Amino acid sequence: MTAAAPTDVCIIISAKNAADTIARAVASALAEPEAAEVVVIDDGSTDDSASVARAADDGTGRLNVVRFEENRGPAAARNHAIAISHSPLIGVLDADDFFFPGRLGQLLSQDGWDFIADNIAFIDAAQAATAHGRIDRFAPTPRLIDLVGFVEGNISRRGVRRGEIGFLKPLMRRAFLDQHGLRYNETLRLGEDYDLYARALANGARYKIIHSCGYAAVVRGNSLSGSHRTIDLKRLYEADRAILAGSRLSSDAEAAVRRHERHIRDRYELRHFLDLKNQQGFGRAFGYALTHPAALPAIIGGILADKTERFRPSGSPAPVALGGKGDVRYLLETLAVDQPQK
């Protein structure tokens, strides 16, 4: 085996029933000269995801497709890909999504990081073929984000855009992950990225963000990443509690993680109440609320907020699948400092 160069990147793609999009994702990763490995994990698909991924091979010997017989979740799929790869840098690409040309080179032009991420463009599936020509060009404007800023950037607030910093798709240094024993938490089916990045920051990771846009996130109404179970919320706030119990955090960082834990726990309490109402009737749900008074503010506040949210006008451009009119939306839009190229 040829020794890996310091800038060699392994791109990991976890796929579940992604036959319609996986070829585009694989092709965009293989088009990046810095991608020394592209590892696709077919996570128990019932369609032809694995064979479609193999058909996208460019013959350079960089593509490795592995199929799980049963679905194990994206965290397990990514951990397996990390275990069977060797490149010193690791990046994740969702099977619905794709890279814009030159993404990895732009990221690797920066120094002084353990994790580095760029802007994300949210687009509708119908825009994918022409999206690169429509993307605004932003100056990189690099900055480091600490644990407090990262966690606060994952807390949604009514009337403003939902917290999305955890959606960023950073390159990660394998050496840092190995040094601190960091891997994805396989009990999580929601927020596994947030949890890994938060634990890395708690261990002193230098997480750099640049504002140039190299990642296209294709938004679909039936996307697996857009749905979750009530139990997934419970496991996510329990992951926050594990960070609090297992890390020596500053007072500001501890307070931020506690706010995120409470935010996710409130979402869980509301969802659990609604599940009981739908499955066992209002009486059972009302009884739960009465016997769990600590959950009452989350339940009452959540119901009232949901009823008023439908009357709130959209305040920013968005793809159709996100309730907009087909516009491109940027995760780091408010930090844009450059004008679109005409």
From Swiss-Prot:
GO molecular function, one term: glycosyltransferase activity
Pathway assignment: Glycan metabolism; exopolysaccharide biosynthesis
A cellular component annotation (GO) from this entry: cytoplasm
Superkingdom to which the source organism belongs: Bacteria
InterPro entries, per the entry: Glyco_trans_2-like (IPR001173), Glycosyltransf_2 (IPR050834), Nucleotide-diphossugar_trans (IPR029044)
Record GO biological process: polysaccharide biosynthetic process
Keywords in alphabetical order: Cytoplasm, Exopolysaccharide synthesis, Glycosyltransferase, Plasmid, Transferase
Keyword Calcium in annotation: no
Top-level enzyme category: transferase
Compartments it resides in: Cytoplasm
The protein's Enzyme Commission number: 2.4.-.-
Similarity comment text for this entry: Belongs to the glycosyltransferase 2 family.
Summary of the function given for this chain in its UniProt record: Glycosyltransferase required for the synthesis of succinoglycan (EPS I). Needed for the addition of the sixth sugar (glucose), catalyzes the formation of a beta-1,6 linkage between the fifth and sixth sugar.
Stated name of the protein: Succinoglycan biosynthesis protein ExoU
Annotated organism of origin: Rhizobium meliloti (strain 1021) (Ensifer meliloti)
